[in-house]
Amino acid sequence: PSSAASDVYKRQDEPLSNLDAKLRVQMRAEIIKLHHRLKTTTVYVTHDQTEAMTMASRLVVMKDGLIQQVGTPKDVYENPENVFVGGFIGSPAMNFFQGQVKDGYFVAGENKIKLSPEKASLLNGQGYNGKDIIFGIRPEHISADPEDLTRTPESVVNAHVDVCELTGAEFMVYSTLGEQQYVARINADSLLETGQNIQLTFDMSKAHFFDKETESRIR
């Protein structure tokens, strides 16, 4: 039966899960257009973070039945509340490194990466100097551009290209920092191939730091 509530509220539970990839993309666009035309409030349930990011005006990220974060797709992507959200939202996922904060640097094994002044002040102010911590950074915030390497020399690491995947406009470059694997999203104009030794730099203004015990973002 129709009611005022049913006219303004719709719930869709993984409606695209059984479609092939191409049709899923097409149907995403159709659902978005339908939603804007009908102006209904729709709760869309999905395990596909790409669907969530592209279709939602607001996201509710849940784990084991508990809400982890609520916000716009942009805010959730750029400011994840914890390691779970950072690792779930985004493809490829956020990179995570275990290490320590030491006198303005993030240290993982023999690698030292200089913190931005803002992050150094935040972490020192919260008492994390000398403590174990989790450092997170998105693949697109790791660069092989010569200008970036020159501009931020204290954020540069030596990297061996374990795997290099060309996706068209970009390379997905897989390497390791210490024993921790990570992926960098590099412009395809760079001349890269598997097996190379290269240098990469981390944009530490885009870095996130998480408490090792709680896995919550430090802010």
What is each of the regions a protein language model found here?
Residues Y105-D162, S190-R219:
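Glycine/charge-rich catalytic "coupling/switch" loops of P-loop NTPases
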Residues R24-K39:
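Helical segment within the ABC ATPase nucleotide-binding domain
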Residues R58, V70, N79:
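Short, glycine/charged-rich "phosphate-handling" switch motifs in NTP-dependent
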Residues M53-A56, F88:
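Hydrophobic Walker B segment
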Residues K74-E78, G86:
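Short acidic-hydrophobic catalytic motif
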Residues D64-G65:
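Conserved ABC ATPase "signature" C-loop
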Residues K39-T46:
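Conserved H-loop
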Residues P1-A5, Y9:
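Single conserved hydrophobic/aromatic residue that forms the stacking wall/gate
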